Amino acid sequence: MTASASRTVAALFALALAATPAVAQVGKPVTVKDANTIAEAEIAALPYMNVEIAKALVAARPFPNATAFDAFLEGKLSKEQRAELYAKLWVHIDLNSASREEIALIPGMGPRMIREFLEYRPYASMAVFRREIGKYVNAKEVGRLERFLRFP
């Protein structure tokens, strides 16, 4: 391939990449499925889930919050199993109105981070959340936490 052809291919690739819309948006995670919208078959394929639980979950929807979702799963999965599942299936919590109990359900949350989440509310934007929580954890962890949130 000539240098001119290489530049043309590179330019076309860059143009195509720039024209491709972003798939993930704030509060719309790529890897954490929404328990209120995920298909029954997808639920059944998740860790610790089966067809029976998937059918019951779909019948119980919509879950108004993460606490209600956790209560639904409580008799079906152990606390450890639920924590592992929540990394893949979740009811996104409202950043400004979630209860302490809801925030505590986010995998990996401890008392300090719960306190920090609550201290800076209300958040005017997701950028404010990133800035404030970024004082306590690195950008990768802020991004991980964002997967469980929605901004009103």
Over which residues does each language-model region extend?
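Bacterial N-terminal signal peptides that target proteins for export
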Residues: M1-L12
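Long, highly charged, low-complexity intrinsically disordered interaction regions
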Residues: A18-L105, I114, R144, R150-P152
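Short, charged, surface-exposed loops that flank catalytic or proteolytic processing sites
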Residues: N65-A66, A124-M126
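Short, tandemly repeated low-complexity microdomains enriched for cysteine and small residues
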Residues: F69-L73, V128-I133
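A basic, often C-terminal nucleic-acid-binding module that engages the phosphate backbone, implemented
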Residues: P111, R115-R121, A127, E141-P152
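Short, exposed beta-strand-loop hairpins at the edges of beta-sheets
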Residues: E132-K140
